[in-house]
UniProtKB/Swiss-Prot annotation:
Keywords: Ribonucleoprotein, Ribosomal protein, RNA-binding, rRNA-binding. This is Small ribosomal subunit protein uS11. InterPro entries: Ribosomal_uS11, Ribosomal_uS11_bac-type, Ribosomal_uS11_CS, Ribosomal_uS11_sf. Part of the 30S ribosomal subunit. Interacts with proteins S7 and S18. Binds to IF-3. It comes from Clostridium botulinum (strain 657 / Type Ba4). Pfam families: Ribosomal_S11.
Length: 132
């Protein structure tokens, strides 16, 4: 190759799947909210988090940040032809309801809402109480 020429890298373009029905997994913790939209098998179509959208610190854990994350993920998933979703919510955070409402407002039909928060049968010792 001649000096100064770069080798052209061929990158495969991501193909658009045509999925009508999928699942939305909302993980809402005390610090952040993550929304992942998958097809019915579990392959990820799109995802977004409050931190990834530029919310930092205590603003990441707000319902508005979760709403924006759900909206962003829904718009990206609807490019794959998604029309209806089942929603699985995990965690104790404040953005749970806001994210579900945002998915509905984006134009997705919610067929099921299920809480899949893991509950220990006296497993690990919880963190110590905060003293403020």
């Amino acid at each position: 190759m001649a000096a100064g020429m770069k080798a052209k890298r061929s990158r495969r373009r991501k193909e658009r799947k045509n999925v009508e029905h999928g699942c939305a997994h909302i993980k809402s913790t005390f610090n952040n909210s993550i929304v992942t939209i998958t097809d019915s098998v579990g392959n990820t179509l799109s995802w977004a988090s409050a931190g990834g959208l530029g919310f930092r610190g205590s603003r990441k854990s707000t319902p508005f940040a979760a709403q924006m994350a759900a909206e962003t993920a829904a718009k990206a998933a609807m490019e794959h032809g998604l029309k209806s979703i089942e929603v699985y919510v995990k965690g104790p955070g404040s953005g749970r309801e806001a994210a579900i409402r945002s998915l509905q407002a984006a134009g997705l039909e919610v067929t099921l809402i299920k809480d899949v928060t893991p509950i220990p049968h006296n497993g690990c010792r919880p963190p110590k109480r905060r003293r403020v």
